[in-house]
Amino acid sequence: MLDVKFIRDNLDQAEAALATRGGAISLARFRELDAQRRKLLTESETLKALKNSVSEEIAKVKDKSTVKDKIAEMKEVSAKIKTFDDELKIVEEEFDTLLMTIPNLPHPTTPVGKSEEENVIVRSWGSLPEMAFEPKPHWDLAEDLDILDFERATKITGARFCLSKRAGARLERALISFMLDLHSTEHGYTEVLPPFMVNRASMTGTGQLPKFEEDLFRLMDPEYFLIPTAEVPVTNIHRDEILKKSDLPISYTAYTPCFRREAGSYGKDTRGLIRQHQFNKVELVKFVHPDESQAELEKLTGHAEKVLQLLELPYRVMALCSGDIGFSACKTYDLEVWLPSQNTYREISSCSSFGDFQARRAGIRFREDEKSKPEFVHTLNGSGLAVGRTLVAILENYQQADGSIIIPTALRPYMGGIEKITK
């Protein structure tokens, strides 16, 4: 959620910044509702002050018959106050709803562009594998090795699900443990295991609601949502809390399954693990001082990159343009890993700074010192990494001519010393 005072004082600037996201994002209704809201509030408070003052005068008079006119006048004032307050409630409800639908303002360092074609390559790492054979897609490799079973998963549940087994299941578990150990031991994150279902307030706090409800799996009676990412429960750990400056930065890492309806993705990545309704992910979440948020984003991105470097998977870092960043983000780096069968890079992690956008929605604040007024923290998060897509990258980049898969050196201790997956 954006700062109302900032928008009010910088309306043209805010509208211009939002325009770089693309689409028609007008703040005209914001201006109208804000003016109505302030006018009604002023009128109500003025009458309340008058009523309090006159009521004190009336209370001092022993013979109430001498102030009948004032008593009658105050009854009329009370009725007007109720009318103003009722109107104010309606206006504020619409105003608050509108605020929840306005996306974050892109950070000044975010490249301006309309779509992913205008994203900027920041850096690349690693050499692309040279193969003396036609590389197979990961689904063919996995089915030949009998480590992923898409057909039975479809029978069990439906499309866009996968059954991992044998070395495939072990490799997925190894990746989760490897990532969590790296982030908690070497990068200093605190490991947490949050609930996989959250309430509406949690989804609203991180920005998934109200705008993206159609993308979520919703349970009823009681109402809960299956999490689309660990970002949601982990960010909400400190919802409605005031932190100490000395506590910052707070860094969490969490493994969770993630659940997404993938609305609007019909026909995209219909085979394999790239786009699933359920997938595993290790997440990185930070709560930081506003002065440190950009530096902390660089650190967090580097921590996600380290996973790919240790697995020796070639990748590149992309700075997303203003038209491609997410609703809540002000700046985002995507990590894209090389997939030989597609002869291209595919996203494996998004690392974002949200400024105080999520903190305002979730009420996450801190104090510079005991006497200071609470301020909003800045939040950041990123995938460290998407486990299924990492498995895809390993299968494709480490495939051999005979269809076997070499296990990356860094994963072998987690695989019981297994060096190769064979038939």
UniProtKB/Swiss-Prot annotation:
Its EC number is 6.1.1.11. Pfam families: Seryl_tRNA_N (PF02403), tRNA-synt_2b (PF00587). Belongs to the class-II aminoacyl-tRNA synthetase family. Type-1 seryl-tRNA synthetase subfamily. Homodimer. The tRNA molecule binds across the dimer. GO terms for biological process: selenocysteine biosynthetic process; seryl-tRNA aminoacylation. The keyword Nucleotide-binding applies. L-serine binds at residues 229-231, 283, 383. It catalyses: tRNA(Ser) + L-serine + ATP = L-seryl-tRNA(Ser) + AMP + diphosphate + H(+); tRNA(Sec) + L-serine + ATP = L-seryl-tRNA(Sec) + AMP + diphosphate + H(+). Pathway: Aminoacyl-tRNA biosynthesis; selenocysteinyl-tRNA(Sec) biosynthesis; L-seryl-tRNA(Sec) from L-serine and tRNA(Sec): step 1/1. This is Serine--tRNA ligase. Its main location: cytoplasm. ATP binds at residues 260-262, 347-350. PROSITE patterns: AA_TRNA_LIGASE_II. The keyword Ubl conjugation does not apply. It is found in: Cytoplasm. Keywords: Aminoacyl-tRNA synthetase, ATP-binding, Cytoplasm, Ligase, Nucleotide-binding, Protein biosynthesis. The gene is serS.
